[in-house]
A protein has these predicted regions:
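Surface-exposed binding/hinge segments that line
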Residues: 75, 119-166
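Extracytoplasmic/secreted proteins, especially bacterial periplasmic and envelope-associated proteins
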Residues: 48, 52, 65, 69, ...
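N-terminal lobe/hinge region of extracytoplasmic solute-binding protein
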Residues: 28-78, 108
Length: 166
């Protein structure tokens, strides 16, 4: 009797805890994203959404350390010059390859009005592609928090952005 009751209850509870299948994802956040343009707004909810869609050169780790994301490594060659080596084999949503030109384009776009990121990265004088997988960033002087600032700058496909009037 106990064995039968245990089996019946087990089967009953298995139905209660079965996975639910739905076509809608519900996500709660403290505010609305104002745009899907990663350089248009510098505010929390937009960054939360952008982080789900885009990647940056670097990203904050769980203990707030700076981790590589699209960059596999970086170094400084002078007080005002940073060199980033870009991961190979990264593709955009349309299958095109990520290049250093896309990264330079994104940084330069983010530091140009009407972008809301201008003040965040105002110490950056220029970003340029040295090779397909090497980016150089020149600042207006030593910037010990540049890597932290770059965690908020997301990379777009230059070709896609230009084709779509961004």
């Amino acid at each position: 009797m106990k064995k039968t009751l245990s089996i019946v209850l087990s089967l009953l509870f298995m139905g209660i805890f079965s996975p639910a299948f739905a076509n809608t994802i519900k996500w709660s956040m403290p505010g609305d994203s104002l745009t899907l343009d990663p350089h248009a707004q510098n505010e929390g909810p937009t960054h939360m959404v952008s982080r789900q869609v885009y990647e940056g050169l670097v990203t904050p780790g769980i203990n707030m350390e700076i981790l590589p994301q699209l960059a596999e490594s970086w170094k400084t060659t002078a007080d005002d010059t940073w060199i980033f080596t870009i991961r190979k084999g990264v593709k955009f949503h349309d299958g095109s390859d990520l290049t250093a030109s896309d990264i330079a384009f994104s940084i330069n776009r983010a530091k140009t009005a009407p972008s809301d990121m201008v003040d965040l990265i105002k110490s950056i004088k220029s970003a340029s592609a040295l090779t397909d997988h090497t980016v150089q960033i020149v600042t207006d002087g030593p910037n010990p928090i540049l890597l932290n600032q770059l965690t908020q700058i997301f990379v777009m496909s230059e070709d896609w952005a230009k084709a779509n009037g961004c």
